[in-house]
């Protein structure tokens, strides 16, 4: 432990220029670069954009029940298996999610069915 305390004291006594020189010498000795963590952090920043392009799960959101709410309620019941009251509450409480975490094909199919019944639908 005494050796570590001595090293800490010696490092604390270094000037900024000496610390920079020590850093360079250690990089050469150990074959590492102090700039590597910065490059990794910058590369990590691009990950959310890639995730947005590769989205595989979608939420089907009923934006508006439309003028023909009865047909929309019937379609919501058929798609979700909800009871009449729950389906009515969902349609009248729009915007609300009808289905969550479905594939793109299934989401498009549900959207088409609800729009055919007169609803306005969004995929998120």
From Swiss-Prot:
Q: Which domain of life is it from?
A: Bacteria
Q: Which Pfam families does the record cross-reference, listed alphabetically?
A: Ribosomal_L12 (PF00542), Ribosomal_L12_N (PF16320)
- Annotated GO MF terms: mRNA binding; structural constituent of ribosome
Q: Which InterPro entries match?
A: Ribosomal_bL12, Ribosomal_bL12_C, Ribosomal_bL12_C/ClpS-like, Ribosomal_bL12_oligo, Ribosomal_bL12_oligo_N_sf
Q: Does the keyword Signal apply?
A: no
> Which Gene Ontology cellular-component terms appear in the entry?
cytosolic large ribosomal subunit
Summary of subunit composition and partner proteins: Homodimer. Part of the ribosomal stalk of the 50S ribosomal subunit. Forms a multimeric L10(L12)X complex, where L10 forms an elongated spine to which 2 to 4 L12 dimers bind in a sequential fashion. Binds GTP-bound translation factors.
Function recorded in the entry:
Forms part of the ribosomal stalk which helps the ribosome interact with GTP-bound translation factors. Is thus essential for accurate translation.
**UniProt protein name:** Large ribosomal subunit protein bL12
Q: Which organism is it from?
A: Brucella ovis (strain ATCC 25840 / 63/290 / NCTC 10512)
What gene is behind this protein? rplL
């Amino acid at each position: 432990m005494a050796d570590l305390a001595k090293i800490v004291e010696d490092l604390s006594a270094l000037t900024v220029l000496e610390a920079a020189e020590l850093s360079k010498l250690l990089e050469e000795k150990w074959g590492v670069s102090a700039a590597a963590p910065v490059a990794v952090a910058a590369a990590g920043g691009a990950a959310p954009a890639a995730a947005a392009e590769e989205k595989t799960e979608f939420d089907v959101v009923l934006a508006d029940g439309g003028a023909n709410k009865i047909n929309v309620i019937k379609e919501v019941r058929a798609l979700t298996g909800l009871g009449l009251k729950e389906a009515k509450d969902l349609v009248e409480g729009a915007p609300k999610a009808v289905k969550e975490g479905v594939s793109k094909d299934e989401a498009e199919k549900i959207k088409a069915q609800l729009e055919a019944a007169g609803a306005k639908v969004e995929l998120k």
